């Protein structure tokens, strides 16, 4: 029996973990590759899952902004990190649309695969962010808690995107870009360590906003253009 998605979506406390039976159902359904081949029920279910996934990405970007703001307040005051030449984000080498208008001109399947690759690329980095931020001087308890919350949302969002790919007849992919900044997060030089955290969280915020934008565009394309 399928879960009633509108009821799940109505609660901000809900997460994609409540959709596990629904997601497992889709893993055992033969994927249908085009919108024209789908019946109305399947298309409606796809739209509901897209709505929930897009909402989750919006929440994730908000929580990441809170993490960035709090880190600035606790560890970056007076250090003028924003004036330094920023480190390159490890996901910068993906060929991504530069703005929402360019995203609207992208194929939704290609855009969805890009979202999956961005999420994949943060698995290792987020794990180390959570582990290392707890060792920061002072009281990093809020930062640690928020980082764990964001990591959980990334995992849930990845599950949702993986399921949507299956629903539209696309194979899941493990494409990702490796992160190699652990030594900087563990540096004995406090300034190097703090700036590395600042850069990593800034990149996380950048990518969480990209993921939200791309999912909003994909939802618009499928809802309004019946385009898959």
Swiss-Prot record:
Disulfide bonds: 89-194, 203-228
Glycosylated position list: 173
Domain of life: Eukaryota
Tissue note: Expression restricted to the placenta in trophoblast cells within the labyrinth zone.
Signal peptide: 1-31
Pfam families xrefs: Hormone_1
Localization terms from the record: Secreted
Keyword Electron transport: no
Biological process according to GO: cell surface receptor signaling pathway; female pregnancy; mammary gland development; positive regulation of lactation; positive regulation of receptor signaling pathway via JAK-STAT; response to nutrient levels
Main location, first listed in the record: secreted
InterPro entries, per the entry: 4_helix_cytokine-like_core (IPR009079), Somatotropin/Prolactin (IPR001400)
Coiled-coil regions listed in the entry: none
Alphabetized CDD domains for the sequence: prolactin_like
Keywords assigned by UniProt, alphabetized: Disulfide bond, Glycoprotein, Hormone, Secreted, Signal
Cellular component annotations (GO), alphabetically ordered: extracellular space
Family, as annotated: Belongs to the somatotropin/prolactin family.
Protein name: Prolactin-2B1
Upper taxonomic lineage: Eukaryota, Metazoa, Chordata, Craniata, Vertebrata
């Amino acid at each position: 029996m399928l879960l009633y998605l509108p009821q799940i979506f109505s609660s901000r406390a809900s997460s994609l973990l409540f959709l596990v039976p629904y997601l497992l159902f889709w893993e055992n359904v033969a994927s249908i590759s085009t919108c024209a081949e789908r019946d109305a029920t399947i298309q409606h279910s796809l739209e509901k899952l897209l709505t929930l996934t897009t909402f989750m990405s919006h929440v994730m970007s908000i929580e990441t902004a809170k993490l960035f703001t709090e880190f600035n307040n606790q560890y970056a005051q007076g250090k003028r990190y924003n004036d330094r030449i920023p480190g390159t984000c490890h996901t910068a080498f993906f060929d991504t649309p530069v703005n929402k208008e360019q995203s609207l001109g992208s194929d939704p399947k290609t855009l969805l695969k890009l979202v999956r690759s961005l999420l994949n690329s943060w698995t290792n980095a987020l794990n180390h962010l959570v582990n290392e931020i707890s060792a920061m001087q002072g009281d990093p308890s809020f930062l640690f808690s928020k980082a764990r919350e964001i990591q959980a949302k990334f995992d849930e969002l990845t599950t949702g995107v993986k399921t949507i790919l299956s629903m539209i007849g696309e194979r899941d992919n493990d494409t990702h870009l490796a992160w190699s900044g652990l030594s900087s997060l563990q540096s004995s030089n406090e300034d190097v360590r703090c700036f590395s955290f600042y850069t990593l969280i800034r990149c996380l915020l950048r990518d969480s906003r990209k993921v939200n934008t791309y999912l909003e565009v994909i939802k618009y394309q499928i809802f309004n253009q019946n385009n898959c």
